[in-house]
């Protein structure tokens, strides 16, 4: 199966990356089926995957997509329920909702005989006492978009001793993905492993409730200045792992090099998410509708290896920190070269309003970061990792 033969497409996930991917593919005439394990669109922005007080840390002008503007007078920073409603409105207005199978669990995706096979299951009401019966199905497609995002599978760092603690006290070690409300940590000592945005936001959320908060990190991307661990600060009641997650052989963080009928939308991090993911969805649509041409497999592989060397590989391969503007500029230039060749109107990349909002965000972020650091230093004691980040020891639990 080549990209010139793509017609039927499976999209896995109905968060923002799945919704915008489906919307653009449908507009281009593709037959799309969306598999969503939850009962509604929204991804991480629906109530169950989010912690109660989660608000956006990227302003709504930066998250505006081409398919739909935010409602008039929407604040710059909003509760996750507002974001979920925005995604839901997009899904309803673009035909995504009617093409989505809700409650569908995708269990296996593989290619055989030139077709992609999606093994999935759904629970049906069979009218019996038990009520529900699992129905397993296999559907075939020409191409697949994996739009489950980079928040779906939590990354647990390989720290000696951590897994043993988790086995012995399962409720005392959780990933930030499982964090919901701060009240359950009232009067507890909490150790945060990781120094990124999740760690900072959850620490602030825990501040009024936890007895003490300790943060263990090595060169976190959002680290405030570290404080030395006090002598009596080795006892912790709960460990929160806030490290991020970590795809190999992909071109432009989108196309699987050995077979570009498999695409990923929503993998990069340290970006403005919604707009970035829509540009990726536009790229997928352009390639599969043959208005944009991918380089040869050899050239894609060469570019991949160059980037691998530049970033050091691993999770940082997908980081767009200080690179988003360049990434989108290059992506849209490539897409528009193809559109020009086909006599199509070019698609605008980042708008003037987006750049204005980005400049405003950076000014506000610097001020907010200063304030947040001051707040955190009042509630967090920081444990500086050694260079090799070797272990976590909880003597009082032995």
Curated annotation (Swiss-Prot):
Cross-referenced InterPro entries: FAD/NAD-bd_sf, Flavin_mOase, Flavin_mOase-like, FMO-like
Q: Which domain of life is it from?
A: Eukaryota
Record-listed E.C. numbers: 1.8.-.-
Q: Does the keyword Phosphoprotein apply?
A: no
**Pathway where it operates:** Mycotoxin biosynthesis
The residues listed in the UniProt record as binding NADP(+), with positions renumbered to this chain, are 194-199
Q: Which SUPFAM superfamilies match?
A: FAD/NAD(P)-binding domain (SSF51905)
What are the entry keywords?
FAD, Flavoprotein, Glycoprotein, Monooxygenase, NADP, Oxidoreductase, Signal
Keyword Glycoprotein in record: yes
Spell out where the chain is glycosylated. 53, 57, 119, 126, 236, 243, 271
* Signal peptide per UniProt: 1-22
Q: What does this protein do?
A: Flavin-containing monooxygenase; part of the gene cluster that mediates the biosynthesis of the secondary metabolite ustiloxin B, an antimitotic tetrapeptide. First, ustA is processed by the subtilisin-like endoprotease Kex2 that is outside the ustiloxin B gene cluster, at the C-terminal side of Arg-Lys, after transfer to Golgi apparatus through the endoplasmic reticulum (ER). Cleavage by KEX2 generates 16 peptides YAIG-I to YAIG-XVI.
Q: Which protein, by its recorded name, is this?
A: Flavin-containing monooxygenase ustF1
Q: Which organism is it from?
A: Aspergillus flavus (strain ATCC 200026 / FGSC A1120 / IAM 13836 / NRRL 3357 / JCM 12722 / SRRC 167)
Gene that codes for this? ustF1
